[in-house]
Each structure stands twice: as structure tokens, then as C-alpha cells.
From Swiss-Prot:
GO biological process, one term: cloaca development
Name of the protein described by the UniProt record: Sodium-dependent phosphate transporter 1-A
Localization, UniProt: Membrane
Entry keyword Secreted: no
Biased composition regions of type Pro residues, renumbered to the chain: 297-308
A GO molecular-function descriptor: phosphate transmembrane transporter activity
One Pfam family matching this protein: PHO4
Main function: Sodium-phosphate symporter which plays a fundamental housekeeping role in phosphate transport.
Keywords from the named record: Membrane, Phosphate transport, Symport, Transmembrane, Transmembrane helix, Transport
């Protein structure tokens, strides 16, 4: 009996040694696969991860650095907890791996080809600032190498059709969910004269739904390392509901009173907050005497003559070696009054005649440009502006907004409203002052600016308000400061959950082929039954976060600013609806596109806010990129696989 056991152990040892010897010949493929997999994970981070926090950065609730830190945490955790299930679909759900029995090296070479083709196209798309689907890339690349190695028989076409259908359904469903959610937010909160009461009542519901949905998803996935695989579905449902109710109670009794107190303290005076990227100014604490209220009787803000004597309000700025004239209280009040009426379209403003017609370039960090103009305008807008703050002049950049505000130039005066002013003057009026010397150009064109402001005074108030914003975001709503306060942290929370969902869904795009490589090498089988190693998912998460930190800002700009303006309220609707769609898809093992869900939500909410708010030209380019992703990544993968199959592998 003992000799039989020893003989059996010896036979097993010989077979294992033979298998290990055979697989050692393809060790170089495994090493090459790890290198290319990290590059692929880098490209996924540079392109796909930007979708998670792009709207949060675009609305201004977090900075780019803060977004990268949060994404690093939640992408990695989501990859380890949710990524294993979707990796199974990517690894063995697209092609029939049993066709590669006895030719493991061919399947390993195919996995490398798929990762290479996907990485190249995603890096190219990131360079072009186009958000594309990482799932599209890896699926197309997998089909490409399989067509070279085994022809069309190696592809599961029905599975491919199911995935293709999900590509169209995911943006549609996510867009509908986001639009419906934002519709109710706008109807019951944003459109109210006082949005705070309804907003505070809705906060517990929003937090509870966000927490409950994501907790159910995490637990229903059944992560073995957390013991969730031993909890039945009804237990998962009860735990999720309990946590959601607890979250709602905490928000109602702790968070809401603090927010209400915070907003009441800020309501002592009007606030102008730059939370949407389209506001005119940015609220900053006052550190200069120019911002303080002046003692004395109330000021009279009645209209002033359109063309007061130039000598009465002349100011000399200290630029370089220029002379300086102190502003006493009377002169300061006069200038404040003129500036305010120029902003409201009810009065003119005098352009000082600089001696010698010598103009100085005022750079971005100049004290006169940064302190005097900014603080003077901020103080007057906060104290005595008569227009509602929902429709300020859009800030194309800092130079344009300050210059237009000081000189009373309205944002979108049409050519025909200037009467007989054509030619060179019309060109000056339409210029956007986008360079560093825009301030000097505005001074030189002061006379034309005065005429434009005078023309605007005669227009009706309603028509003037409709003409303030640029044509592309006409009638676009802007969140009030109190609404922004309500939705800021909520959008951060939904963005974090969206990043978590993305880590679970899209880490498979980078690690699925690498998992196949490792398991083939480790077990010498093309269809191993071993689960996905956690350390491989962590490896992919590190590569994804590296790509986000180094190159993620390009696609963040497209998603958060270029496609459509984002506010905290609309960003919350986008984040929550798209996160729910992606998390549910991850739990059923369907590799939907996170990019499609997010872009669908952004476009639908932007269109609901205003039909002209969406950059349809950019959306067309993104849509075209979606359709060419599968064939381009497939062709690149097929070319690399042909090189392996016909040249490299026969030589080894």
C-alpha cells in the first residue's frame, strides 16, 4: 500500500514537472503580458476613469487633485470587490476557449494581442480628448485575434450581439433615469422661489437611495473575502434597507440642521457662487477695504447721466511707472455707482482718458487686474445688483468677464442691434478678448463699448436678460448658492459610488486577458476553474489610478466642461442614475460601457436644461468614435496576432 502511494506521488510529480517545463517555454509571453496589461490599465485610467469624476470637477464641487485622490481609493476598492465577476465574462464569454486545447501558447499570444490593440486605441482617444468605451476596445480586440487564430468559428456571436445590445441600452436607460431624476429635482426644488425647504426635505431620501442601492450591489456580488457570499439575498436586502433608513435618519437629524444653519448665516447678504463653471465671479472672503460697507446715509442708486463729464470721474491706475491718484470716499462711491448701472443696463460708465494714449498690458496676475477690478465688481454685484443671479454673463474666461463687466458690454449683442455700426466697429464689438492684453484692447475700444452699453439701455429688461448668455447655452438654468450648498456633498458621494462601480466594471477590461494569461501559465489549461486572483485585480487598479493621475485631465475636461455645463444639481442626477445602471450591470455579469452610461446621462440632462446647452458637434465626434472603436481595436489586435501566429511562434 505504501509503495503504491509513493508510486502515485512520483507519477504526479513527474507530470507536474513536465507541465511546468512545457509552460516555462512561454514564460516570456507571461512577462510581456504583464507589461502590456499595465499599459492597458494606464489607458483605461486616462480615458474611462475620467467619466467618474468629470462632472464633479466640471461643477466645481471638487478640484482635480481631490478627484484623483478619491478616485484612487474607490477605483481600487471597487476593482477588488466587484471586478472578479465581470472578468469572467471578458475572459471566457466572448470566445470559446476550448478551441485552444493543446495550443495554450496561441491563446496566450492572443491575449497579448488583444491587450495591445485595446491599449493603443484608448491612448489615441485620450490624446484626442474623446471618451470611448474600454469594453468596446477589449471586445473588439478579442474578436480580432480570434478571427486570425481560429476564424469566425471561435467567436460566440450570440454573446457578442447581447453585449452590443447593451451598448445601446446602457446610454438610453441611463439617460432616461438621469432625465427623470433631474426633472423632479427641478420641478420640486430648483423652480421654487425658496428651494431650501424642499431641498432639505429631499436630502434624506437622496442619501438613503444612494447608500441603499450601492450597499445592496456590494453585498449581492458576494465578495468571498468579506463573507458576503454566505448571506442570502433576503438578508442582503434587509441589511441594505436598514442602512438606508439609518442614513436617512442621520441626515435628517444631524446634516439638515447644520446645512440650514449654515445657509441662514450666509443669507445675511446676497452671495454669488461660482459652482457651475458659467458664473461671472467667484465668492472669496474679503481682505481689502474696498469690500467693506462705507458708513453714512444710504446711497442713491438712481440712474446717472449717460455721458457725464470725463474729468469728474477720471482715475489714473498705477501700472508700472504711471502716476497714482488716491480715491477718496466720494470718488469711490461715484465709480461704484457707475459700475453698478453699467452692469444693470440702466446707466453708462466713463472710460478714463489715459494720458498720451499709452496702454500697458495687464497680465493675469497683475494687482490692478486681480484686486481692484475683481473686488470692486464683486462688492457691487453682491450689494446692489438689480438683475436676478440666475442669468449672469457667461465666463468664457477670466479676462472676458471682467472686461465686459467693467465696461458694460453685454455678452451677446447681435449685429443688427447696433444700427449702422458695421465693418471694423462691429468686429471689435464681437471680439471675445481672449488674450492677456484684452484689458488694454477694451480701454482702446472704450468709445465703442460706451455706445454698445447705451444701445443696451434702451432694450426691454426681459429681452436683455434673454440675451445675456451666449447663444449655445440660451435659457440655461444656474443653481442658486443655497441649492449648490445642498447638492455639493451629495454629488461628491454619488461620484465616489460611481468610481467604485467603475472600478468593479472596467478593471476587467484591463485585467481579463491578463487573468487568462496567468491561469493558463499556472494550471497549463485553457479553461481553468480557479477564481480570479485578488492581487491581479489590485495590479490592474494601480495601473488605472496611475493613468488617471498622469493623463486623466484631458477627458475630464470633455466630460465636465466641453460637452455641456454642469451644476451640482444636474451633476448629482447624472452621477446617481449612471452609477445605478453600471452597478446593476456589474452584478449580473454584463460588461456594459461606463462611458456610454455617463455620456448618455450628461447629454440627456443637458438637453433637458436647454436644447442649446449641449455641444452637438462634440457629441457627434464622440458618437463616431464609439462605432469605430470595435473595428479599429480589432484590426490592431489582428495585425499583432498575425505577427505572433505566422512569424514568432513558429520560431519558438
Amino acid at each position: 500500500m505504501e509503495s503504491t502511494t509513493l508510486a502515485s506521488l512520483a507519477a504526479v510529480s513527474v507530470l507536474a514537472a513536465g507541465a511546468q517545463t512545457d509552460m516555462s517555454d512561454v514564460l516570456w509571453l507571461l512577462i510581456l503580458g504583464f507589461v502590456i496589461a499595465f499599459i492597458l490599465a494606464f489607458s483605461v485610467g486616462a480615458n474611462d476613469v475620467a467619466n467618474s469624476f468629470g462632472t464633479a470637477v466640471g461643477s466645481g464641487v471638487v478640484t482635480l487633485r481631490q478627484a484623483c485622490i478619491l478616485a484612487t481609493i474607490f477605483e481600487t476598492v471597487g476593482a477588488m470587490l466587484l471586478g472578479a465577476k465581470v472578468s469572467e465574462t471578458i475572459r471566457s464569454g466572448i470566445i470559446d476557449v476550448h478551441m485552444y486545447n493543446g495550443s495554450e501558447a496561441v491563446l496566450m499570444a492572443g491575449s497579448i494581442s488583444a491587450m495591445f490593440g485595446s491599449a493603443v486605441w484608448q491612448l489615441a482617444a485620450s490624446f484626442l480628448k474623446l471618451p470611448i468605451s474600454g469594453t468596446h476596445c477589449i471586445v473588439g480586440a478579442t474578436i480580432g485575434f480570434s478571427m486570425v487564430a481560429r476564424g469566425h468559428q471561435g467567436v460566440k456571436w450570440l454573446e457578442l450581439l447581447r453585449i452590443v445590445a447593451s451598448w445601446f441600452l446602457s446610454p438610453l436607460l441611463s439617460g432616461i433615469m438621469s432625465a427623470v431624476l433631474f426633472y423632479f429635482v427641478r420641478k420640486f426644488i430648483l423652480n421654487k422661489d425658496d428651494p431650501v425647504p424642499n431641498g432639505l426635505r429631499a436630502l434624506p431620501v437622496f442619501y438613503a437611495v444612494t447608500m441603499g442601492i450601492n450597499l445592496f450591489s456590494i453585498m449581492f456580488t458576494g465578495a468571498p473575502m468579506l463573507g458576503f457570499d454566505r448571506i442570502p439575498w433576503w438578508g442582503t436586502l434587509l441589511i441594505s434597507l436598514g442602512c438606508a433608513i439609518l442614513t436617512a435618519l442621520v441626515v435628517w437629524f444631524i446634516v439638515c440642521p447644520r446645512l440650514k444653519k449654515k445657509m441662514q448665516s450666509k443669507c445675511l447678504g446676497p452671495n454669488i457662487a461660482d459652482t457651475s463653471g458659467t458664473q461671472l465671479v467667484e465668492k472669496k472672503p474679503s481682505s481689502n477695504g474696498l469690500m467693506d460697507h462705507h458708513p453714512g446715509p444710504p446711497r442713491n442708486y438712481s440712474p446717472v447721466p449717460q455721458t457725464p463729464p470725463a474729468d469728474s470721474n477720471k482715475v489714473a491706475f498705477d501700472i508700472g511707472g504711471s502716476a497714482e491718484t488716491d480715491l477718496d470716499k466720494k470718488e469711490f462711491d461715484t465709480k461704484d455707482q457707475d459700475c453698478t448701472h453699467a452692469l444693470n443696463g440702466s446707466g453708462g460708465i466713463v472710460i478714463p482718458d489715459l494720458s498720451g494714449n499709452q496702454f500697458h498690458t495687464v497680465h493675469k496676475d497683475s494687482g490692478i487686474y486681480k484686486d481692484l477690478l475683481h473686488k470692486l465688481h464683486l462688492a457691487k454685484v453682491g450689494e446692489c445688483i438689480g438683475e436676478p443671479v440666475e442669468k449672469p454673463i457667461r465666463r468664457n474666461n477670466s479676462y472676458t468677464s471682467y472686461t465686459m463687466a467693467i465696461y458694460g458690454i453685454h455678452g451677446s449683442l447681435k449685429d443688427g442691434e447696433g444700427g449702422s455700426r458695421t465693418g471694423l466697429d462691429g468686429e471689435k464689438r464681437r471680439s471675445r478678448y481672449d488674450s492677456y492684453n484684452s484689458y488694454c484692447t477694451a480701454v482702446a475700444d472704450g468709445e465703442a463699448a460706451l455706445e454698445d452699453a447705451a444701445l443696451a439701455v434702451g432694450m426691454e429688461d426681459e429681452a436683455l436678460r434673454e440675451d445675456v448668455l451666449e447663444e449655445d447655452i440660451d435659457e440655461l438654468e444656474i443653481d442658486k448658492p443655497e441649492v449648490s450648498t445642498l447638492f455639493q456633498f451629495l454629488q461628491i458621494l454619488t461620484a465616489c459610488f460611481g468610481s467604485f462601480a467603475h472600478g468593479g466594471n472596467d478593471v476587467s477590461n484591463a485585467i481579463g486577458p491578463l487573468v487568462a494569461l496567468w491561469l493558463i501559465y499556472d494550471s497549463a489549461s485553457v479553461a481553468p476553474s480557479a477564481p480570479t486572483p485578488i492581487w491581479l485585480l489590485l495590479y490592474g487598479g494601480v495601473g488605472i489610478c496611475t493613468g488617471l493621475w498622469i493623463w486623466g485631465r484631458r477627458v475630464i475636461q470633455t466630460m465636465g466642461k466641453d460637452l455641456t455645463p454642469i451644476t451640482p444639481s444636474s451633476g448629482f442626477s447624472i452621477e446617481l442614475a449612471s452609477a445605478i445602471t453600471v452597478v446593476v450591470a456589474s452584478n449580473i455579469g454584463l460588461p456594459v460601457s461606463t462611458t456610454h452610461c455617463k455620456v448618455g446621462s450628461v447629454v440627456s440632462v443637458g438637453w433637458l436644461r436647454s436644447r442649446k446647452a449641449v455641444d452637438w458637434h462634440l457629441f457627434r465626434n464622440i458618437f463616431i468614435a464609439w462605432f469605430v472603436t470595435v473595428p479599429i481595436s480589432g484590426l490592431i489586435s489582428a495585425a499583432i496576432m498575425a505577427l505572433f501566429y505566422y512569424v514568432i511562434l513558429p520560431l519558438t
